[in-house]
Amino acid sequence: DKYQFEIYSTGKVQRELAREMSMTTLELNQLMRSDHKYDHMIDDATARISRENPDKNIIFDSRLAWNFVESSFKVFVSVSTDVAAERVMNDNRGEEERYQSYEEARRMLVERAATESVRYKEIYKVNYMDFSNYDLVIDSTYCTPDIIAEIILDEAKEYEKNGKQAQSKMLVSPYRLLKEDDISKDDRQSLENIAKEYEKVSRITDKIIKVKKNDETFTVVEGIEYAKAAYIADVPYVSIKVID
């Protein structure tokens, strides 16, 4: 509402469908593996709405909208599994998606992601966790929704300005790259000047940090000084490039 976008959420559609069928969302996901009509029903609706409303500002909240919505700015909003579990525990999603404990929520999220990944590969031959499918990948683990929304809007405007061409960008909090113990007193002294410059940065630092990624763990392989300075300065985001 604040940004005057309509929101179409396939997750909400799926939860409503699960409730109507007296199932949990995980049970519906498992059913959808053997009966693809539900996937096609939801995904066809996504494609139809985008075709019928080319001039509307619509946010498609969907794991596969990037594959069905033409001429769109494609964003993947990531989050650590631990924080995702905390969020769903605190989110009222109805009886069909209610958890008894944090551990149960985390386990169910992992199972759901695995089930959906297999299903999407079976039906559409796509991997929604392949970040090259997106114009922007932004991690939400440590940042506020307002800052994330502002960054997405700014990047989308650049996309429009550049003739709907985008160079894929991946943004994470420096807290995803480092822990407090990774930064020594010597680091704080030697990086003082860079950190002071970064204190003036409201959103994203200008250096691209090269990392390796193993599941949810990032390891910095180039640009560690910039990652540490961003951590010290409490900058919301750094740009990263994942390398093999």
Task: Specify the residue positions occupied by each region the protein language model found.
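Short loop/helix-cap segments at secondary-structure boundaries that form the rim of catalytic
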Residues: 66-72, 129-132, 230
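Glycine-rich phosphate-binding P-loop
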Residues: 1
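Short alpha-helix boundary/capping and kink motifs at helix termini
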Residues: 161-219, 231, 238
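Small-molecule kinase domains that catalyze NTP-dependent phosphoryl transfer to phosphate-bearing small molecules
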Residues: 97-148
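ATP-dependent small-molecule kinase phosphotransfer cores
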Residues: 6-69, 82-85, 94-97, 107, ...
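Switch/connector loops and helix/strand junctions flanking conserved nucleotide-binding motifs
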Residues: 83-88, 145-147
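Short, amphipathic alpha-helical "lid/cap" segments that border enzyme active or binding sites
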Residues: 42-43, 145-153, 195
